[in-house]
Amino acid sequence: MPTYRFNYLRFNKLCVSFFRSKFDKRPFASQKFPENLVPDNSSNDANSQPEEVSSKKPWYVDEKHNLFPKKAHFDAVALPPIPKGAPNFLADVLNLLKKKYYATDLSFVNSPADSFWCDSDLILLASCNCGSEVVSATNGLLRLLKQKNVGPVNVDGLTSASRRKILERRMRKRSNLSNRQLNTSENNWTCLSIENFGISIHVITKNFREYYKLDNIEHVKDETLYSDLEHGKQSRVSLTSKSTPDNSLPPNFINNHSNVFRRSFHTCNFSLKSAASLYCDTQDILLNVNSQNLTSTLEKYKKMHLQNPNNFSLDFTLSIFERLRKDSSLQLTTKDINTLFSTIALSPTKLSMASKHSKNLVSERMLYLSLMYKSLVDLKTIDSFSLKLLFLKFMICSCMVKGESNFFLDNRIFLLERIMNRYGIPMTIDTFLLMQFILAKSNRWSEVWRRWDNLRKAGVVFNERLYNHVYLLAFESKNERVINYVLTNIFEDMVSQSPPIPASKLMATSLKKCVQSLPEKYAHSFPSVRNYIAKMENSMTH
């Protein structure tokens, strides 16, 4: 008698399939509409039955407009009209942003012809919901522009692949730190600059766009940069000169007159001794000035002004500038303007190192820099863009006052930085290094590292000059914590950078100073830094 083996596994599968087919109550099990979604047709025909849906389509296909209203919402987004004379590829850019990346609030902005906060003739703004959508839309635009052969496209705001690897490696080493502490957050603003057509495309999150008020940027005037920087209740009399006027006169006597009258009034109230010495120095400085020795004369005056602040004033510096400006035989160059700006921005104080007195000096510097800038705009000696960048650089420089043992930093330096960011004014490398120097000397190292990381996020490739500058700042600070941070994180960034930083004797000297300034307990620490220094020194000797 034959024997049969019972297949329990097959039996279990058959049982499960049977019970599923009989008792499955899921909406997809039967190809009919669920009762709650069946339309009420009782008014038309009481005996009518709901129609069965085709077996090839599930029930939710006919209800897609009710279930997925998001697509219908984005289809309703209107595209802005393309300006006259614009290139044809802008239509494809708008369609790509709308249909594929669901960008909203698409709009064009025409930058004024005399504006210095933008090099582009036309600006396109697009908003996304989050930082990841900003990155996706930017990468998609890069691929489209490459297909259109529009020429070189500069991208700002995207994090490079090598930088992401460094941050991920630090995250694995320090699991107790969050993404925010390691600055691994998403990109909230990117900019694509098409050089051949003078077009900039800004892809930004909605929160950032609302905060920076980019839609009103075409109505911005340049006067915003140098007017009302004080935003306080301080009288304009204290901003005019360090000399005190006659107290017998009422305060409104000075306030009700023009700036020229107030400057003349304060100048006439100098003491007889100061006026006599000032007159002698004036005759020595401005004697036989011509176009050949103008630069050397201004440099000589700058040296005298910085070394003898009791004999000179900002009023006198402005009067020298006005005399040179009105002389048709003399022509001020960029170097001469730089010397005059630096003389005002670095003017020392005759008062004690009190916070109130230092703040008044910063206000005076800003006022006289603004007055000189207004005169240079009318003079048109250099182009407007270079002049305004130079003006902003020395406005930042004027916010720091050097004392006998410490530095005073005015908080208006952060207001200037916000103005530059809000109006899209580019910060040059020289201005960035100046900002880092001022913050480091004022012991604001958290602000130094935050700006360093922001520059890294913008995709800027650091060179030897930037790294050497931060090494020297750390060495001069004599701060053990700062030097440790530089020899770990900053050095790791430099070694991992592609293309690599070329070996130089200056770099080896700066790193060696940082290592030697540490206490003896770090004698065997930082082996990678020590090996790098030895390798660079050996390569320079052979």
UniProtKB/Swiss-Prot annotation:
Keywords: Membrane, Mitochondrion, Mitochondrion inner membrane, Transit peptide. mRNA stabilization factor specific for the 0.95 kb oli1 mRNA. Also involved in oli1 ring formation. Residues 1-28 form a transit peptide. Belongs to the ATP25 family. It comes from Schizosaccharomyces pombe (strain 972 / ATCC 24843). Pfam families: RsfS. GO terms for biological process: mitochondrial mRNA processing; mRNA stabilization. GO terms for cellular component: matrix side of mitochondrial inner membrane; mitochondrion. One of its GO terms (molecular function) is poly(A) RNA polymerase activity. InterPro entries: Atp25, NT_sf. Residues 39-52 have a biased composition (Polar residues). The gene is atp25. Residues 34-56 are annotated as: Disordered. It is a peripheral membrane protein. This is ATPase synthesis protein 25, mitochondrial. PANTHER family: ATPASE SYNTHESIS PROTEIN 25, MITOCHONDRIAL (PTHR28087:SF1). It is found in: Mitochondrion inner membrane.
